[in-house]
């Protein structure tokens, strides 16, 4: 059975994508952002450095929440073994693929901590033509909602999905299911590789629990000021819903 969304403070609903190649740069960003960011996503680029779990420990020591975004996908027994080990670390969110019901059920059963598992639905860099190339000739929203319902039935705690699909997911799954939205663009589309993007206020109005933002903060002239501006927008959006 899916567990209720994490009891997040408003400032923990902004997750910064720590997309850097090594520990030194990761911790430099944590210092630069200070208390403007309380939640960090660490992914595949950092894993390749061999310093992934050192960074995870450092974040936990600084009282930051951690989102492990490694999109685990394997046979059920192997994926479950990974989740069992990962649940021993101070992790708030972790991603698995949302394509395999038996694997999702095994992962849900193996999670022995407060970590919430999020199923990856359709990457925000993909549109309908990309799905068609994979043999799925359907609109992304239909695939996302179908996978969200399958994840919920398997006992997974939520999904990671475009803010464009947050409303349909919330309508289909109800209030007790976590929705985390990447590809958020506070100032609108910026012409990068993200195709299905929305703004901060829209994501929360449609039911998102948290958002993931990387480049709009990282590439800002003043990253801490950019993060604080997003925090203010989140607070306003939450107050309005």
Curated annotation (Swiss-Prot):
Keywords: Decarboxylase, Lyase, Pyrimidine biosynthesis
Residue numbers annotated as active site: 71
Enzyme class: lyase
Annotated Gene Ontology cellular component terms: cytosol
Molecular-function annotations in GO: orotidine-5'-phosphate decarboxylase activity
EC number: 4.1.1.23
Superkingdom: Bacteria
SMART domains according to UniProt: OMPdecase
Keyword Phosphoprotein appears in the UniProt entry: no
SUPFAM superfamilies xrefs: Ribulose-phoshate binding barrel
CDD domains: OMP_decarboxylase_like
Catalytic activity annotation: orotidine 5'-phosphate + H(+) = UMP + CO2
InterPro entries from the UniProt entry: Aldolase_TIM (IPR013785), OMPdecase (IPR014732), OMPdecase_AS (IPR018089), OMPdecase_bac (IPR047596), OMPdeCOase_dom (IPR001754), RibuloseP-bd_barrel (IPR011060)
Gene Ontology biological-process annotations: 'de novo' pyrimidine nucleobase biosynthetic process; 'de novo' UMP biosynthetic process
Pathway in which this enzyme or protein is active: Pyrimidine metabolism; UMP biosynthesis via de novo pathway; UMP from orotate: step 2/2
Pfam families cross-referenced by the UniProt entry: OMPdecase
Binding site for substrate: 19, 41, 69-78, 124, 185, 194, 214-215
Subunit record text: Homodimer.
Function: Catalyzes the decarboxylation of orotidine 5'-monophosphate (OMP) to uridine 5'-monophosphate (UMP).
Family, similarity comment: Belongs to the OMP decarboxylase family. Type 1 subfamily.
The protein, known as: Orotidine 5'-phosphate decarboxylase
């Amino acid at each position: 059975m899916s567990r209720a969304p994490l009891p997040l403070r408003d400032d923990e609903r902004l997750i910064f994508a720590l997309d850097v190649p090594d520990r030194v740069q990761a911790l430099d960003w944590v210092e630069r952002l200070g208390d403007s960011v309380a939640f960090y996503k660490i992914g595949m680029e950092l894993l390749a450095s061999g310093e992934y779990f050192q960074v995870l420990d450092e974040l936990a020591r600084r009282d930051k929440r951690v989102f492990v975004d490694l999109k685990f996908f394997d046979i059920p027994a192997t994926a479950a073994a990974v989740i069992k080990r990962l649940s021993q670390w101070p992790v708030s969110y972790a991603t698995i693929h949302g394509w395999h019901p038996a694997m999702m059920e095994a992962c849900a059963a193996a999670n022995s901590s407060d970590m919430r598992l999020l199923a990856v639905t359709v990457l925000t860099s993909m549109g309908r033509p990309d799905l068609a190339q994979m043999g799925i000739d359907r609109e992304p929203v239909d695939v996302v909602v179908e996978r969200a319902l399958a994840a919920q039935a398997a006992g997974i705690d939520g999904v990671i999905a475009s803010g464009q699909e947050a409303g349909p997911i919330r309508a289909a799954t109800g209030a007790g299911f976590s929705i985390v939205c990447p590809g958020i663009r506070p100032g609108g589309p910026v012409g990068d590789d993200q195709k299905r993007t929305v703004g901060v206020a829209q994501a929360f109005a449609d039911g998102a629990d948290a958002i993931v933002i990387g480049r709009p903060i990282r590439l800002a002239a003043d990253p801490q000021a950019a993060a604080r501006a997003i925090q203010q927008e989140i607070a306003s959006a939450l107050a309005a819903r």
